[in-house]
Amino acid sequence: MSKEQILLRINQLKEQLNLWSKQYYVDDNPSVDDTEYDLALKELISLENLYPEFITSDSPSQKVGGTVSEKFLKITHKTPMLSLGNVFNFDEFLEFNTQVSKVSNNLNNEYVAELKIDGLSISLVYENGVLVSAATRGNGVIGEDVTTNVRTIKSIPLKISKKERVEVRGEIYLSKAEFEKINQKRLLNNEDLFINPRNAAAGTLRQLDSKIVASRNLDAFLYYYISDDSPNLNQYESILKLNQLGFKTNKETMLCKNLDQIKAYIDKYTNLKNDLDYQIDGIVFKINDKNLQNSLGFTSKIPKWAIAYKFPAEIKQTKLLDIFATVGRTGKITYNAKLEPVFLMGATISAATLNNAEYIKSKDLRINSIVKIKKAGDVIPEVIEAIKDETFYNLEVFQPILYCPNCHSLLEKNENEVDQFCINSSCSMKILRSLQHFSSREAMNIVSLGDRSLEILFNLEIIQNISDIYKLEEYKDQILAIENFGLKSYLNLIDSINMSKNNSLEKVLFGLGIRHIGSKTAKILARKYQNIDNLMKASYDELIQINSIGESLALSIIDWFKIEDNLKLINELKSFNINFNYLGAKINSDSIIANKTFVITGTLTRPREEFKTLIENNAGKISGSISKQTDYLLAGNNVGSKLEKAKKLGVIIIDEQQFFDLLKSEKG
């Protein structure tokens, strides 16, 4: 065949395969068997391998994965991806509808009812009919670029017929059947099991190797259509438009015309939720009328025209087989329940946290008793009470342990605290948990050094403390000798470790595990002191002057830097060129808004995070509510009750332009 004929055949195969994919994954109505599809795909891949110049991003061959990404870039959402408010029963929904009715003047508002898929939100952007980007929700303003991985999801089209820019939003999920397959495979490979389908889907989408993503058969339901040429589509029209363009939407979606239909929909899926092949944790109700949506507007975090109805927690009975304790990175002892397996909220539950000894005593939980367990949504299962039948009082009363379950050191408990602690600095489990915390995503984000890998390296005594992480190149041969740890894994590990050296101060500060310092406090301290040396010199009196730093936290910081081993660790990390400087924008303490408190409300023309950052960079403070201490209310469009309260309290009210003018002005 000539090149022209090859190109023609490739285009024919692409068109045919895309049609078959839509019929199978979106319409649920396949017209050919798997063998015919596979043969056509094999022919396409063969031709594209011979003529790689003809490979395009919309080719079905690109759904098999293969690109390994070094890291995920960031994408700013053109329209913020907001979260939803919640209601937990029908009476609360009626209250929400009453608020809507104050604007619509109609109690029987039309709502689109959508099952709330327990997955992760995604934003897809198409330009000239081709998928150009896919981003996670992230913080609502900025998400992670997962385009390469999303291309492998068979129910998401790489090409659509519309040429204008289109943004489509939906939920990526893993079916229950696929979840079971993945966990069975992980069990055979002696890998940690995923807790639930949502965690598995999230973990899969963040894989650096898209071949792994392709192998796990993620799926997607799309529900939101944004396009400049169709700004006034009603919500249900938006769903129909998505169907027309070849997107997979949930067939259970319904246009409810009155409250009776809404109640019937809730009752139906409260009973059927566990029979679906995907997990749901509620129902989303959205006002259908686009004009009414616009009139209702938004708060700072949520749309006022949509609400999530969350299913009530499920409660079941099972047997408490055992109570066992674990030790965390700070030495805190956590008690856990081993349960006779029971199916609850779409998952098999065999364990639950019992928090601490005081919690167990307060509920009088006893081994071999029958207990009630509760689970709501993605929340960890909770043991709520013991069934005190005639056999209960013959069971042994629970007694707290006295010694660490790992190193067997005597535990300590302060009078004013409910928790017990292992204070042995050499406790191996404390050390391992500290290492896992240091390398975690929220801290140093050493992507290739997961909990499992760290445990293996720790048990082999290759890593025994934080500084050992930065010496791994000395152990190349030992690491390569580990089963399933090839050269590629080793190189990825070293790259991740080297990248972590460039983190900003707040990441390493959080990673060090100083008691009471969370990620938010770490950032406050990093912004204030700019580098680790300044923080080490800070006095107690100086620390407690900082907003949100209390006495116990200030003492914890002072005490941590008094310990010789901790100072030695800082110096060792410096010798490995770990950055200990704050890399964020420097605070302008001389700004006119320094120490002024702002509240932000309404819809703004720029992302809310941008205004928060500007305020913080100019030494201002952010509050979520109006009070006598509020200096300014920054008000956008569609403001709510905060405006009236600000007027009553005499708070200065400014718009966006006045805010920027204020920043430019000088202190008088």
Curated annotation (Swiss-Prot):
<keyword id="KW-0464">Manganese</keyword>
<feature type="binding site">
    <location>
        <position position="407"/>
    </location>
    <ligand>
        <name>Zn(2+)</name>
    </ligand>
</feature>
<keyword id="KW-0520">NAD</keyword>
<feature type="binding site">
    <location>
        <position position="171"/>
    </location>
    <ligand>
        <name>NAD(+)</name>
    </ligand>
</feature>
<keyword id="KW-0235">DNA replication</keyword>
<keyword id="KW-0234">DNA repair</keyword>
<dbReference type="InterPro" id="IPR036420">
    <property type="entry name" value="BRCT_dom_sf"/>
</dbReference>
<dbReference type="InterPro" id="IPR004150">
    <property type="entry name" value="NAD_DNA_ligase_OB"/>
</dbReference>
<dbReference type="Pfam" id="PF03120">
    <property type="entry name" value="DNA_ligase_OB"/>
</dbReference>
<feature type="binding site">
    <location>
        <position position="286"/>
    </location>
    <ligand>
        <name>NAD(+)</name>
    </ligand>
</feature>
<dbReference type="Pfam" id="PF00533">
    <property type="entry name" value="BRCT"/>
</dbReference>
<comment type="function">
    <text>DNA ligase that catalyzes the formation of phosphodiester linkages between 5'-phosphoryl and 3'-hydroxyl groups in double-stranded DNA using NAD as a coenzyme and as the energy source for the reaction. It is essential for DNA replication and repair of damaged DNA.</text>
</comment>
<feature type="binding site">
    <location>
        <position position="310"/>
    </location>
    <ligand>
        <name>NAD(+)</name>
    </ligand>
</feature>
<dbReference type="InterPro" id="IPR004149">
    <property type="entry name" value="Znf_DNAligase_C4"/>
</dbReference>
<dbReference type="GO" id="GO:0005829">
    <property type="term" value="C:cytosol"/>
</dbReference>
<dbReference type="InterPro" id="IPR013839">
    <property type="entry name" value="DNAligase_adenylation"/>
</dbReference>
<feature type="binding site">
    <location>
        <begin position="34"/>
        <end position="38"/>
    </location>
    <ligand>
        <name>NAD(+)</name>
    </ligand>
</feature>
<keyword id="KW-0460">Magnesium</keyword>
<dbReference type="InterPro" id="IPR018239">
    <property type="entry name" value="DNA_ligase_AS"/>
</dbReference>
<keyword id="KW-0862">Zinc</keyword>
<dbReference type="InterPro" id="IPR012340">
    <property type="entry name" value="NA-bd_OB-fold"/>
</dbReference>
<keyword id="KW-0227">DNA damage</keyword>
<feature type="binding site">
    <location>
        <begin position="83"/>
        <end position="84"/>
    </location>
    <ligand>
        <name>NAD(+)</name>
    </ligand>
</feature>
<dbReference type="GO" id="GO:0006260">
    <property type="term" value="P:DNA replication"/>
</dbReference>
<dbReference type="GO" id="GO:0046872">
    <property type="term" value="F:metal ion binding"/>
</dbReference>
<dbReference type="InterPro" id="IPR041663">
    <property type="entry name" value="DisA/LigA_HHH"/>
</dbReference>
<feature type="binding site">
    <location>
        <position position="114"/>
    </location>
    <ligand>
        <name>NAD(+)</name>
    </ligand>
</feature>
<dbReference type="Pfam" id="PF03119">
    <property type="entry name" value="DNA_ligase_ZBD"/>
</dbReference>
<dbReference type="InterPro" id="IPR001679">
    <property type="entry name" value="DNA_ligase"/>
</dbReference>
<dbReference type="InterPro" id="IPR010994">
    <property type="entry name" value="RuvA_2-like"/>
</dbReference>
<dbReference type="GO" id="GO:0006281">
    <property type="term" value="P:DNA repair"/>
</dbReference>
<protein>
    <recommendedName>
        <fullName>DNA ligase</fullName>
        <ecNumber>6.5.1.2</ecNumber>
    </recommendedName>
</protein>
<feature type="binding site">
    <location>
        <position position="422"/>
    </location>
    <ligand>
        <name>Zn(2+)</name>
    </ligand>
</feature>
<feature type="binding site">
    <location>
        <position position="404"/>
    </location>
    <ligand>
        <name>Zn(2+)</name>
    </ligand>
</feature>
<keyword id="KW-0436">Ligase</keyword>
<keyword id="KW-0479">Metal-binding</keyword>
<feature type="binding site">
    <location>
        <position position="137"/>
    </location>
    <ligand>
        <name>NAD(+)</name>
    </ligand>
</feature>
<dbReference type="GO" id="GO:0003911">
    <property type="term" value="F:DNA ligase (NAD+) activity"/>
</dbReference>
<dbReference type="Pfam" id="PF01653">
    <property type="entry name" value="DNA_ligase_aden"/>
</dbReference>
<feature type="domain" description="BRCT">
    <location>
        <begin position="588"/>
        <end position="668"/>
    </location>
</feature>
<feature type="binding site">
    <location>
        <position position="427"/>
    </location>
    <ligand>
        <name>Zn(2+)</name>
    </ligand>
</feature>
<comment type="similarity">
    <text>Belongs to the NAD-dependent DNA ligase family. LigA subfamily.</text>
</comment>
